[in-house]
UniProtKB/Swiss-Prot annotation:
<comment type="similarity">
    <text>Belongs to the short-chain dehydrogenases/reductases (SDR) family.</text>
</comment>
<dbReference type="InterPro" id="IPR036291">
    <property type="entry name" value="NAD(P)-bd_dom_sf"/>
</dbReference>
<dbReference type="InterPro" id="IPR002347">
    <property type="entry name" value="SDR_fam"/>
</dbReference>
<protein>
    <recommendedName>
        <fullName>Probable NADP-dependent dehydrogenase in aabA 3'region</fullName>
        <ecNumber>1.1.1.-</ecNumber>
    </recommendedName>
</protein>
<dbReference type="GO" id="GO:0016491">
    <property type="term" value="F:oxidoreductase activity"/>
</dbReference>
<keyword id="KW-0521">NADP</keyword>
<feature type="binding site">
    <location>
        <begin position="4"/>
        <end position="28"/>
    </location>
    <ligand>
        <name>NADP(+)</name>
    </ligand>
</feature>
<keyword id="KW-0560">Oxidoreductase</keyword>
<dbReference type="Pfam" id="PF00106">
    <property type="entry name" value="adh_short"/>
</dbReference>
Length: 106
């Protein structure tokens, strides 16, 4: 089974990738932080394919999937874990750019 996990560079996504590989699945790990995905690949080996890109960028997403080898493209499970929270100000004091980025990502 091939599992695609967004937000795989830390937290729940990181742990989910480790668990899925331990259960015998192949995992595509997506996140913006290339170095964190590479560290996870070192830990998990060939059962993990790092696919760095910004999920809020449609062009980057399309380009990323073009980089996937053919035998990694039949995705069985999506763990849609990517997300972010910018600014902790009340809504009326928040920046519009922060809201736009959160909506695009989450």
């Amino acid at each position: 089974m091939i599992v695609l996990i967004t937000g795989a560079s830390s937290g729940f996504g990181w742990e989910a990738a480790k668990l899925c590989v331990a259960k015998g699945h192949r995992v595509i790990g997506c996140a913006r932080r290339t170095e964190r995905l590479q560290a996870l690949q070192k830990e998990l080996g060939d059962a993990f394919f790092p696919l760095p890109f910004d999920i809020a960028d449609a062009d980057a997403l399309n380009a990323a999937f073009e980089r996937l080898p053919e035998d990694w493209r039949a995705i069985d499970v999506l763990v849609n874990n990517a997300g972010l929270a910018l600014g902790q100000a009340p809504a009326h004091e928040s920046r519009l750019a922060d809201w736009e980025q959160m909506i695009a990502t989450n």
